[in-house]
């Protein structure tokens, strides 16, 4: 499942009144009896077989499993009334809001890399809009993907175009203490994109030189793109503000692929990371069985202190 699928699927969840769904209310195994060592953030649609399709019921279910963060790529497109309900629930339950996608992503044509002034203006306008969404949700981070390569320009000029635009976006975000996190995406799922490697994101963040421009290190994407995960995380550490998770192959929950998430989480925890790790992946199995498998997997890989 790729990012476009996540963005599209997240838009299908609608709001409603909060109640405990009978599908899970009586299951003693699903009560809030586990405290995670890190802030893993599920998304809408991950537990809809057990929690139901109502977004507020899903949030309650997420909380009841012990998760204390939540992310939603499609939050910006949701009705303000629902955003306010979500914000109220998160605040009352001491949960953190994770990333949402801040702008239109150009998957098939260049925008930020091109230096086109109209596309730059569009991007900055959408960043301004996202400030209001972040305020409403008490969110700190928003995802930025610089879009497609401009194959008619040298990579050096493209990089400069991206840096100049991100500096302007940082000027918008800094007064509000908000952070755009740049997400490198892998070549296999998203061929032709400008930003692919952690070192490239690190270089850009250093050039922008703003507390409002940091890295979203997606462990799934970087396993495919470059591997060598922990050394690369170490090299980029002081510019990483957010992590996302997914095993490879398959982009499903930890323990279903080749990545040793227990060791990675132990390393991240030892480094003192207290931010969010977004669960931006699918479920390896369908229905209730698959949702229980996700919960079990996170309890397994989170058990790294013993």
Feature-to-residue mapping (PLM):
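Active-site acidic/histidine proton-transfer and metal-coordination neighborhood
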Residues: 10-19, 30-34, 93, 112-214
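Active-site-proximal loop/turn and secondary-structure-junction residues that shape catalytic pockets
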Residues: 46-48, 74-76, 103-106, 148-150, ...
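Metal-dependent catalytic neighborhoods of phosphoester/phosphodiester hydrolases
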Residues: 80-86, 155, 287-290
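Catalytic domains of carbohydrate-active enzymes, especially glycoside hydrolases
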Residues: 56-75, 138
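Glycine-rich, proline-tolerant flexible connector loops at the mouths of alpha/beta enzymes
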Residues: 71-91, 146-150
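Histidine-acidic metal/acid-base catalytic patches
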Residues: 2-63, 195-217, 221-306
């Amino acid at each position: 499942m790729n990012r476009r699928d996540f963005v599209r699927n997240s838009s299908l969840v609608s709001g409603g009144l909060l109640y405990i769904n009978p599908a899970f209310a009586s299951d003693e195994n699903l009560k809030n009896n586990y405290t995670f060592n890190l802030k893993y953030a599920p998304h809408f649609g991950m537990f809809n077989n057990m929690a139901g399709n109502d977004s507020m019921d899903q949030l309650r279910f997420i909380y009841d499993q012990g998760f204390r963060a939540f992310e939603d790529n499609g939050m910006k497109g949701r009705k303000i009334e629902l955003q306010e309900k979500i914000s109220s629930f998160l605040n009352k339950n001491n949960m953190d809001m994770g990333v949402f996608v801040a702008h239109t992503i150009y998957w098939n044509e260049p925008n930020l890399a091109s230096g086109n002034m109209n596309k730059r203006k569009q991007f900055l306008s959408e960043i301004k809009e996202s400030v209001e969404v972040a305020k409403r949700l008490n969110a700190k981070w928003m995802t930025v993907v610089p879009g497609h390569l401009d194959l008619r320009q040298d990579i050096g000029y493209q990089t400069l175009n991206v840096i100049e635009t991100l500096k302007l976006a940082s000027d918008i975000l800094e007064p509000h203490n908000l952070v755009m996190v740049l997400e490198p995406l892998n070549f296999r799922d998203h061929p032709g994109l400008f930003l692919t490697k952690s070192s490239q994101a690190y270089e850009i963040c250093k050039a922008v030189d703003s507390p409002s421009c940091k890295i979203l290190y997606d462990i799934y994407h970087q396993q495919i793109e470059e591997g060598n995960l922990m050394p690369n995380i170490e090299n980029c550490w002081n510019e990483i503000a957010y992590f996302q998770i997914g095993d490879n192959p398959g982009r499903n929950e930890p323990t279903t692929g080749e990545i040793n998430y227990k060791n990675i989480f132990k390393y991240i925890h030892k480094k003192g990371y207290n931010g969010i790790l977004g669960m931006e992946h699918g479920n390896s199995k369908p229905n209730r069985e698959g949702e229980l498998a996700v919960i079990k997997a996170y309890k397994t890989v989170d058990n790294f202190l013993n």
